[in-house]
Amino acid sequence: RQLPVEGDEETYPGDLWYVPQVEAAFVPADLKLMIDGFKGSGYTLYVNGREVTETPVRSYLDAEIKTVPLSGYFVEGTNTIAVKLTVTKKSDGMVDLLKLTGTFAVAEADGVERIVPLPGTLELGDWVRQQLPYYSGTVYYTAKVALDQEQLQRKLMLRADVGKDVLLVKVNGQLVKTCLWKPYAADISAYVREGENEITLGVVNTLMNLLESTRNPSGLFAAEIVPYDRYEVRF
């Protein structure tokens, strides 16, 4: 964001403070802060009154986005993150959201969000509503399906509803198809066998949930295997 009050050139450089608070029911061992969008000549990062001295390293998202570990600075309860940013012109300031990453979920109660442990499993439906509001990445859903010889004589189409996201279809450990858009369907006939089969559906959602906190609905909303009769027509 641009500075809320534009000063004269004589007022620069100057220091701005950005001070959010984060509630944590536990502290993930891999908790990190993503550093992106700091416009200024330099910054100093503090957590709970302690200066973070670790050297930022490249994030998994982008070479320009850096991360620093925070697990050694966080505590259970209320945590205060403070960024002192030295600005040198009117357009300097905090231009992107601060982002925390790690192995955790986010619970909300009375309008307050809190870092909590990941749920053991997810149900079909929107994972944003299952304590993963800002997760961007891939979630895999796995089921066992038993098929007999009669069913194997038919063409078996797997169909799924993943909203506007990307679908990965795997059968018995083999990648069958990557569906980038509708129809989210794949012919799995050549990948199944008599008896038990493992069907894995991966859903890859938008990065906007992480980068912009948009809470776009994400997840596997429905899935089915539809059998079709095979016909041969000769002329």
PLM ranges: what are they?
Residues E6-T11, Y18-A24:
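Regulatory/sensor and coupling segments of signal-transduction and defense proteins
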Residues Q21-E23, P69, A105, K144-D148, ...:
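Generic structural detector for well-ordered beta-strands
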Residues P20-G49, I81, V145-N172, I199-L201:
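Aromatic-lined ligand-binding clefts that engage carbohydrates, nucleic acids, or primary amines
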Residues G40-T67, K164, K170-A185:
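Solvent-exposed beta-strand/loop surfaces of large extracellular or lumenal domains
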Residues Y18-P20, Y134-Y135, Y141, Y184:
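Aromatic side chains
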Residues V22, L33, Y43, F104, ...:
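Generic low-polarity alpha-helical segments
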Residues R1-P13, G37, R58-A143, K155, ...:
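An acidic-aromatic loop/edge-strand motif
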